[in-house]
């Protein structure tokens, strides 16, 4: 089975559409969404509707911190993020908010764990940024691979049978073999607001038959997404950063 994995879409309809089209062209069998469907971007209704439609057809979706902030507040967010959440609250319908509120923090199937931020304390929204923070998740997990997002930068960590943790930066389009002798923690980057210096949307395909993970980079219409952000009256920085991938 080929599983398409998407995280941090952030109300970017153009990026999500491009990634879904790319995934279909690569003949995926299953879709998994790892949170942060709203915030920053100008198309929250489209993105939530799209994710909800996929869930109704059997896809998995978990909740991210921006989705959570729609109901719980923005005390821990930057000013621009908080402004985007406040605007988003006025865009979503009651049923869309109910959908987001009802999503789980994590989900699992077979030997895979799906979560937005981390494995060891998913409700705390701590970031995985280095070997130490990755090791906490790798120790806490029992699955062969955990897949998450949250930091908007693609990364891959693994733990050996002796407990040694290592990492490397994945290259887009290159199949990565997932040795059964290791535990794996894959950080998927972002569909809707990449921050690794590459403006192309990022998602991944997990092939459980071949036991490979492939990060994908997909160009999309940034001009359209940025124009909508400005037209909505959201902070201009949220539009500008799409071009820089930062």
Question: Model-predicted segments: where are they?
Answer:
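His/acidic metal-ligating clusters that form di-metal
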Residues: 27, 91-159
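Active-site environment of divalent metal-dependent phosphoester hydrolases
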Residues: 10-15, 39-41, 66-71, 108, ...
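Short, conserved loop/helix-junction motifs that constitute active-site signature segments
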Residues: 53-56, 139, 178-180, 206
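Hydrophobic/aromatic beta-strand patches that form the interior of the parallel beta-sheet core
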Residues: 32, 60-62, 115, 147, ...
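Charged helix-capping and loop-helix junction motifs
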Residues: 45-47, 128-135, 168-169
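Acidic, His/Gly-rich catalytic cores of divalent-metal-dependent hydrolytic chemistry
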Residues: 161-246
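Core catalytic region of metal-dependent phosphoesterases/phosphodiesterases
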Residues: 2-6, 11-99
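Active-site-proximal beta-strand elements of phosphoester/diester hydrolases
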Residues: 2-10, 111-118, 185-189
């Amino acid at each position: 089975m080929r599983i398409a994995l998407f995280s941090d879409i952030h109300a970017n309809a153009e990026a999500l559409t491009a990634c879904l089209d790319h995934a279909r062209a690569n003949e995926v069998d299953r879709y998994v969404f790892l949170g942060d469907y709203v915030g920053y971007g100008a198309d929250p209704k489209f993105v939530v509707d799209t994710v909800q439609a996929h869930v109704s057809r059997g896809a998995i979706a978990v909740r991210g911190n921006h989705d959570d902030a729609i109901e719980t507040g923005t005390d821990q967010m930057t000013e621009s993020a908080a402004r985007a959440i406040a605007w988003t609250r006025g865009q979503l319908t009651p049923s869309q908010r109910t959908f987001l509120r009802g999503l789980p923090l994590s989900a699992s199937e077979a030997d895979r764990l799906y979560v937005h931020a981390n494995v060891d304390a998913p409700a705390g929204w701590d970031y995985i940024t280095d070997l130490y923070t990755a090791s906490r998740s790798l120790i806490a997990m029992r699955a062969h691979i955990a897949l998450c997002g949250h930091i908007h930068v693609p990364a891959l960590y693994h733990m050996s049978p002796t407990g040694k943790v290592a990492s490397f930066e994945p290259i887009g389009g290159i199949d990565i073999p997932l040795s059964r002798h290791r535990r794996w923690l894959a950080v998927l980057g972002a569909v809707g607001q990449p921050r690794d210096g590459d403006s192309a949307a990022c998602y991944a395909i997990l092939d459980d038959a071949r036991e490979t993970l492939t990060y994908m980079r997909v160009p999309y219409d940034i001009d359209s997404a940025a124009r909508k952000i400005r037209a909505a009256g959201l902070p201009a920085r949220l539009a500008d950063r799409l071009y820089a991938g930062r």
